[in-house]
């Protein structure tokens, strides 16, 4: 559970319902548990992939099963993919929208993690799927976006350079990279503590 999703849902008047992710299965979502929690009041499924805080990267099969649930129950998909470039050990990120072309999917991303500029508060939303069925929703998103002030001008220039330039995150997650070494050390030290288990983040 990433607390911002819980808080945002509650702030909007909704009731967040958490589904299980199983440590013994590499923190993959428990699809039976997820389906058991879907009710007529359920509006969407939030998928944080790569996951925060577990570090799990969901398989295409797992994502396909989540999409099948969303399709069966006519649910919106909310894909938090802010960690999509921070991958270790040949892990592969599969964008949720690519598995659900027939469903409305909102994908959230930004600069804060992969480009290490959290203070810029620069991000984006991509809406895919049958948008013709969500025109009023999309208009509402547009109104909300227009009510917000834009990032500062240097940050806007940084977005263009970051997305179009050298992807330096690769140097940090490959062998010898600082993020990979920190991940490995933290994982090793946690597992050395008696009674503590830790799945290696992907």
Roles of regions detected by a PLM:
Residues 98-177, 187-189:
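Conserved core segment of the aminotransferase class I/II
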Residues 179-180, 195-202:
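Conserved PLP-binding catalytic core of the aspartate aminotransferase-like
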Residues 1-14, 23:
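Substrate-binding/gating loop at the entrance of the active-site cleft, primarily
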Residues 17-19, 96, 108:
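Hydrophobic residues at beta-strand termini and immediately following loops
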Residues 7-9, 69, 116:
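Hydrophobic/aromatic ligand-binding patch that stacks against planar heteroaromatic rings
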């Amino acid at each position: 559970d990433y607390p911002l999703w819980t808080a945002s849902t509650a702030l909007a008047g909704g009731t967040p319902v958490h589904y299980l992710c199983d440590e013994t299965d590499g923190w993959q979502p428990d699809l039976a548990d997820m389906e058991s929690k879907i009710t007529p009041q359920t509006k969407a499924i939030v998928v944080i992939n790569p996951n925060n805080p577990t570090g799990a990267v969901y398989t295409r099969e797992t994502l396909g099963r989540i999409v099948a649930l969303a399709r069966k129950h006519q649910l919106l998909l909310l894909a938090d993919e802010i960690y999509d470039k921070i991958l270790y050990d040949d892990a592969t990120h599969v964008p949720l929208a690519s598995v659900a072309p027939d469903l409305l999917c909102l994908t959230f991303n930004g600069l804060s993690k992969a480009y290490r500029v959290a203070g810029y508060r620069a991000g984006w939303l991509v809406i895919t799927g049958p948008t013709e069925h969500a025109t009023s929703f999309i208009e509402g998103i547009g109104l909300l976006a227009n009510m917000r002030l834009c990032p500062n001008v240097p940050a806007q220039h940084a977005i263009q350079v970051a997305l179009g330039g050298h992807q330096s995150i690769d140097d940090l997650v490959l062998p010898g990279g600082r993020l990979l070494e920190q991940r490995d050390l933290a994982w090793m030290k946690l597992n050395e503590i008696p009674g503590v288990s830790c799945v290696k983040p992907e």
